[in-house]
UniProtKB/Swiss-Prot annotation:
Example of a GO MF term: structural constituent of ribosome
Name of the encoding gene: rpl22
Organism: Sulfolobus acidocaldarius (strain ATCC 33909 / DSM 639 / JCM 8929 / NBRC 15157 / NCIMB 11770)
Superkingdom per UniProt: Archaea
Name the record gives this protein: Large ribosomal subunit protein uL22
One record GO biological process: cytoplasmic translation
Biological role: This protein binds specifically to 23S rRNA. It makes multiple contacts with different domains of the 23S rRNA in the assembled 50S subunit and ribosome.
GO annotation, cellular component aspect: cytosolic large ribosomal subunit
PROSITE patterns, alphabetized: RIBOSOMAL_L22
Keyword RNA-binding (UniProt): yes
Pfam hit, one: Ribosomal_L22
UniProt record similarity statement: Belongs to the universal ribosomal protein uL22 family.
C-alpha cells in the first residue's frame, strides 16, 4: 500500500495545519469543483461561501465536468463561468474537513482568524465492486466510487 504524501510547500511546517479524509462517498467530480472554488480563500470566506451554496443562495461554478450543466443567474461575475450546481453532499464533506483542519491549527497554536487555504485537492479513491442478481441466472455489476480530499491551511 502506498504512503500518503502532502505536497512540498515553501511555508514553514510550524505555520501549517493539515487534514485529510479518505474513502468518502462523494463524487470526485463535484469535489474537484468545490476545491477549485475555495482554493486560496480565507477560512471564514470559504465557510461563508459554502454555506451560501448549501442554502442555494449562490451557485457553485463548474469549470470541469460541466457538460449538460445549466446556466445559473446567481453565479458571481468573479468566477467568469456561467454554469453551476449545488453539490450538497460534497460540500458537507469539505466543511467537515475544514473543521478538522481548523481544530488541528488550534491545537498547534495558530491564529484561526488569519488562516488561508494554501492547498486543497480531491483524488479518486477505491472502487467497490458489487453484483446484483438478475432473472434467468444473470447478474449485473454495480460500482461504488469513493474519493479522498486533503487540505493544508497556512497562517498568513
Amino acid at each position: 500500500m502506498s504512503k500518503w504524501v502532502y505536497p512540498i510547500l515553501s511555508i514553514p511546517e510550524d505555520k501549517l495545519a493539515k487534514a485529510v479524509i479518505k474513502n468518502i462517498d462523494a463524487s470526485v467530480r463535484d469535489l474537484y469543483n468545490v476545491c477549485k472554488a475555495i482554493r486560496g480563500m480565507n477560512l471564514k470566506e470559504a465557510r461563508e461561501f459554502l454555506n451560501n451554496v448549501l442554502e442555494e443562495k449562490e451557485a457553485l461554478p463548474f469549470w470541469r465536468y460541466s457538460h449538460g450543466t445549466s446556466h445559473r443567474s446567481n453565479i458571481s461575475r468573479k468566477w467568469k463561468v456561467k454554469s453551476g450546481r449545488y453539490p450538497k453532499k460534497a460540500i458537507k464533506y469539505v466543511l467537515k474537513l475544514l473543521d478538522n483542519a481548523e481544530n488541528n491549527a488550534n491545537s498547534k497554536g495558530l491564529d484561526i482568524d488569519n488562516l488561508k487555504i494554501v492547498h486543497i485537492a480531491a483524488h479518486k479513491g477505491l472502487v467497490l465492486k458489487r453484483y446484483m442478481t438478475r432473472a434467468f441466472g444473470r447478474s449485473t455489476r454495480k460500482y461504488k466510487y469513493l474519493s479522498h480530499i486533503e487540505v493544508i491551511l497556512g497562517e498568513v
